[in-house]
């Protein structure tokens, strides 16, 4: 992995924490660097309560590191939450599942209205805020649609739509499929297709 995320506090903002993602760009290929820049471009263009907020980005260490300052979602992600419930052998309350599902759909709707396909919706990319809300994050492989359908086979196998698996052209429906897989996972505490 090229990146690590740190919890940081700016001196002028006592008590306010941010997530600071450090990306070692010195060892990246061109395509991987393009993904990192893409995440900044997309995050900086969107402001939505269910998408991780963007604050700043800068280069450091003689331009070998890219740092992205984002909203802190200090309660982990849906993958860790599902795992905690699975270990307890206890299911999530239906109201919590519905709340998370609706918030994911609203965040996804915002992306899609901006013609952005996330392409890697999965439990580990849905973050939990202190207020209990969920936020879509990790937009590095997201793609802004420019008319033609997408063709690159990308994402996480458990959440890939049939058209992505079959290497066929796809669009926003691939994200909708992935959110459906997540809804199933929140209810059953396991991905639908294993």
Describe these PLM feature segments.
Residues 4:
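Conserved N-lobe ATP-binding subsite of Hanks-type protein kinase domains
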Residues 56-58:
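A short, aromatic-enriched beta-strand patch in the conserved N-lobe beta-sheet
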Residues 61-71, 79-80:
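A conserved loop-to-beta-strand element in the N-lobe of protein kinase catalytic cores
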Residues 175:
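Conserved catalytic-loop aspartate of Hanks-type protein kinases
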């Amino acid at each position: 992995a090229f990146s690590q995320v740190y919890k940081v506090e700016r001196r002028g903002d006592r008590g306010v924490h941010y997530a600071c993602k450090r990306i070692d760009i010195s060892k990246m290929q061109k395509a991987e660097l393009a993904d990192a820049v893409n995440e900044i471009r997309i995050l900086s263009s969107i402001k939505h309560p269910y998408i991780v907020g963007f604050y700043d980005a800068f280069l450091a260490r003689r331009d070998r590191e890219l740092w992205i300052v984002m909203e802190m979602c200090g309660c982990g992600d849906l993958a860790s939450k599902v795992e905690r419930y699975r270990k307890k052998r206890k299911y999530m309350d239906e109201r919590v599942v519905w709340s998370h599902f609706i918030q994911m759909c609203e965040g996804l709707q915002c992306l899609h209205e901006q013609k952005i396909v996330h392409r890697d919706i999965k439990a580990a990319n849905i973050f939990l805020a202190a207020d209990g809300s969920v936020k879509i994050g990790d937009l590095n492989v997201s793609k802004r649609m420019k008319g033609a359908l997408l063709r690159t086979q990308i994402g996480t196998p458990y959440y890939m739509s049939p058209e992505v698996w079959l290497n066929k052209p796809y669009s926003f429906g691939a994200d909708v499929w992935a959110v459906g897989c997540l809804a199933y996972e929140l209810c059953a505490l396991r991905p639908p297709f294993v």
